[in-house]
A protein has these predicted regions:
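A short, structured loop/turn motif at beta-sheet edges
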Residues: 27-29, 80
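Conserved beta-strand/short-helix segments
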Residues: 30-34, 106-107
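WD40 beta-propeller blade-start loop/N-cap
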Residues: 13-16, 68, 137, 191
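Asp-box/WD-like beta-propeller blade repeats and closely related beta-sheet repeat scaffolds
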Residues: 1-27, 35-40
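Short, flexible loop segments at boundaries between secondary-structure elements
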Residues: 197
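Beta-propeller domain segments
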Residues: 21, 38-43, 48-64, 71-187, ...
Length: 223
């Protein structure tokens, strides 16, 4: 029933963040890639593995920082047939009701995303900080992400399906690639949920979205 395991083994020991651990995915090179949130809303973390996307071998060895300066990297998904990693980012909560917005971004190895000083406001604090693919609602607790490239029909191809826990929204971010960069156009996708969190693509091409509050998993497939 999911409450007991015959055995378990800790393969990598990471710092504790403010919330739950971020997502974990298998990278094209065979490494595991995972998000680790900051231990606070706007402090400078003591550990280099906090507020970061980290990478390690499946047995837990060779722990590395993939990208840093991300307050809470939650959902992770690779764009199919590429090494382009899309990450949902929860931003700071101490700057007002409408600032800053959460982000969806393509994150590349070695990037520094500016937390806690840069949150998209521009100026010297954001010098050399990458730009997000799409800005989402403020304090939305953006969560899971899955990439569709035609499984739901040509009108919904090349899109990131993104869940916002706090707003109850599931959004579609239409992706356009220009060289190594992506731009995103945000559109509604699914309404009526309480607190959507995980978003997955099934082996049959359906988008699966889980509602944290109701315990219901919704399946959205091409008719």
């Amino acid at each position: 029933d999911g409450t007991k395991f015959a055995q378990h083994k800790t393969i990598v020991d990471l710092p504790v963040g403010m919330g739950k651990p971020g997502g974990i995915v298998l990278a094209p090179d065979g490494r595991m890639v995972m998000g680790v949130s900051a231990p606070c809303d706007s402090c400078t973390p003591a550990s280099k593995y906090s507020a970061a996307v980290v990478s390690f071998m499946p047995d837990g060895s060779d722990l590395q920082v993939f990208a840093s300066g991300i307050r809470a990297p939650v959902g992770l998904a690779y764009y199919p047939q590429t090494d382009d990693l899309l990450v949902t980012m929860n931003q700071r909560d101490d700057l007002g009701a409408q600032t800053p917005g959460d982000w969806l971004a393509v994150v590349r190895r070695g990037q520094q995303w500016g937390f806690p000083d840069c949150y998209g406001q521009g100026g010297s604090a954001c010098t050399d900080v990458p730009q997000p693919t799409a800005a989402l609602d403020a304090h939305a607790a953006v969560s899971g992400v899955a990439i569709v490239t035609g499984q739901l029909g040509t009108s919904i191809g090349n899109s990131a399906i993104v869940a916002e826990w706090a707003t109850g929204k599931v959004l579609r971010v239409e992706l356009a690639k220009d060289g190594n960069a992506y731009t995103g156009t945000v559109q509604p996708f699914l309404t009526g949920m309480k607190n959507p969190v995980p978003v997955l693509l099934s082996s049959r091409g359906a988008v699966l979205v889980g509602d944290w509050t109701t315990g219901v998993v919704f399946s959205i497939a091409k008719a």
